Amino acid sequence: MDIHDAIHARRSVKLFTDRPIAREQIERLLEAAAQAPNHRMTQPWRFYVLGPEARRAYGAVLGARKAKKVEDPEAARAVVEKVTAAEAALPCEIAVSMVLDASPEIREEDYAATMMGVQNLMLAAHAMGLGTHLKTGAVMDDPRARAAVGVPDGERIVALIQLGEP
């Protein structure tokens, strides 16, 4: 697939088949991500392919955050259950973090490089016939989300990529 075609045709996909993504496909996507430019060759990105338990744990954290906006306790429990189940059902989810440099200038450059890696991964997935959906937001800074995903201190979660066959 021509890169221009991939750029113009790629769309966020929110519904996937339940078919798992092969390890070889994931490795190929991670190799594409690692080709992103990065100043000073810091290679600040880290990719965590979440297994079913990590997806479920992350879903519980996300669901609990969303449930705080719901006044009725029963409805709040339903939100947690729905979000947890939706995350657990994903065929693949990849958490993307970056190593935090002490220098604010380098941190900014590293964030840009990491997100270029995300774009590479998403375009490569599209070229392989896979769909992606990029997730970001305040939940990324939640210590419970970090624990669920397994991101160590010294790294910041910048995105989650949901991946599957459309």
Go through the PLM ranges and name each one:
Residues 1-89:
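N-terminal amphipathic, basic helical "cap/leader" segment at the start of enzyme domains
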Residues 25, 52, 144-145, 151-152:
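Short Asp/Glu-rich motifs
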Residues 33, 94, 100-147:
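Small-aliphatic-rich amphipathic alpha-helix that forms the alpha element of a beta-alpha
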Residues 43-44, 135, 156:
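Residue-level detector of family-conserved "landmark" positions at structurally sensitive sites
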Residues 52-54, 99-100, 165-166:
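Short loop segments at secondary-structure junctions
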Residues 87, 94, 160-162:
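C-terminal edge-of-domain segments
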Residues 89-92, 130, 153-157:
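Short coil/turn connectors at secondary-structure junctions
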Residues 149-166:
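A glycine-rich helix N-cap at a beta->alpha junction
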